[in-house]
Amino acid sequence: MLIGVPKEIKADEYRVALTPAGAEMLSEDGHNVVIESGAGLGSGFTDDFYAEAGVKVLDTAEEVWAQAEMIMKVKEPIHQELPYMRDGQVIFTYFHFAADKSLTRACMKAGVVAVSYTHLTLPTKA
């Protein structure tokens, strides 16, 4: 699977959804990873760290969204990102559907597979 990590653009959000170490683990499991240039800077990870982990660094979020089968984010997609979503694409992030009906509708209209971190549990239900 080709996994993409765009830079977070929501106000005051500096985290990144995937560390270089995590990207390296995904690569070792046979996945390809792309990341938007600068996406890790707010968390202390340079583009070089990602490149050394086998990640392809892309110039724009649009490129990341266009190439990736699965998008990993910290925060839910915001208005500027909604046009990038496409049918069958998996988006793995913190979704807040109850608080944002327009986001729910946009995800349904685009046909994405929306997976929210908040709804994942371990086999022990923890």
Task: State where each predicted segment sits.
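Rossmann-fold dehydrogenase core element
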Residues: K109-Y117
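An N-terminal-biased, well-structured beta-alpha scaffold segment characteristic
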Residues: L2-A110
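Conserved small/polar residues in nucleotide/adenosyl-binding loops
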Residues: Y117-T124
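A very general structural signal that marks isolated residues within well-ordered alpha-helical segments
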Residues: N32, T124-K125
